[in-house]
Swiss-Prot record:
Example GO BP: translation
HAMAP family per record: Ribosomal_bS6 (MF_00360)
TM region(s), chain numbering: none
Organism from which the protein derives: Tropheryma whipplei (strain TW08/27)
GO molecular function, one term: structural constituent of ribosome
UniProt-recorded name of the protein: Small ribosomal subunit protein bS6
Matching SUPFAM superfamilies: Ribosomal protein S6
Assigned GO CC terms: ribonucleoprotein complex; ribosome
Gene3D superfamilies in alphabetical order: 3.30.70.60
Length: 100
């Protein structure tokens, strides 16, 4: 969606716990295809390995990464597609910041 306004989003990404050492670089690589569309990563925070409340895709824990970014709606759709295609990603949650 070219021309749609940039909005701020917060994305929680859970990766397999075996990816803890390279979690930041793996998550950053997911944004490479959409950077030309104006997506800007404002902040990326690796929270470390966390236990899940229930089993997800046969796993009980994973590395949690929180990403704050600016993007338009079309870019967010592409980011979601990239996340679904990446086997390392266990679960994602996307929130629009500042929305009531």
């Amino acid at each position: 969606m070219l021309g749609s306004p940039l909005r701020e989003y917060e994305l929680l990404v859970s990766l397999g716990s075996e990816f803890e050492p390279e979690a930041e670089s793996r998550v950053r690589s997911l944004f490479t295809p959409v950077e030309p569309e104006g997506v800007t990563v404002k902040h990326l925070d690796v929270l470390g390995v966390r236990k899940f409340a229930y089993e997800i895709k046969g796993r009980n824990d994973g590395v949690c990464v929180v990403v704050r970014l600016l993007a338009n709606a079309g870019s967010i759709a592409e980011i979601g597609r990239q996340m679904r295609l990446t086997e390392d990603v266990i679960r994602t949650k996307l929130l629009r910041v500042g929305r009531k």
